[in-house]
Amino acid sequence: MTQPGELVLKACACLVDARGHLLVFRHPGDESMQLPKGTVEPGETPHDAVRRELLEESGIRFDGPLESLGTLDRFCPAGGVEGTRIAHPQLWHLYLMRSVDALPETFEHVAIGSPQEHGLRFAFRWLAPDAPLDGFLLPYQQAIVRARAAV
């Protein structure tokens, strides 16, 4: 359980296809647009966590190389779609993942894993390199800008 002021590590997947489009989804909890992301579990590395989170949230297994896009600092207020009751700082580890598999243009996946998201239906689509970032909260916008610069 998160303690007040305790830093929580997160891993964020920036999966791009051959066109440079980025995999994003609409979160049904608040209708915001997001990237696959989640908490690094005890004993887990951010590298392992980003692969697990992508699989849990999208159903996509990614075994390819990870390219670090650095980290982002974020303060997470209590409440919201993350289901936290305690405000806390977060450190997001961002990874670029280049898909070599053909994936559908749009698809839905029922999330597994965390109690807050288990059973939620996420609607995925690909975000074009020049698409506006309306609907994304600031940390996701920052992650997308980094991913776009690296592609």
Where do the model's predicted regions map?
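Short, charged/polar surface micro-motifs in flexible loops or helix N-caps
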Residues: 16-22, 30, 41-42, 74-77, ...
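A generic structural signal for short beta-strands and their flanking turns/coil linkers
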Residues: 29-31, 62-64, 70, 89-93
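The catalytic Nudix box helix
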Residues: 35-71
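Short, cationic low-complexity segments
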Residues: 115-126
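N-terminal strand-loop-strand
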Residues: 1-35
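A short, polar/proline- and glycine-enriched secondary-structure boundary/capping micro-motif
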Residues: 33-37, 116-118
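Active-site-adjacent beta-strand/loop module that shapes the phosphate/pyrophosphate-binding cleft
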Residues: 74-111, 125, 130, 143-148
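Short hydrophobic/aromatic beta-strand or adjacent loop that forms the aromatic wall/cage
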Residues: 8-12, 90-94, 121
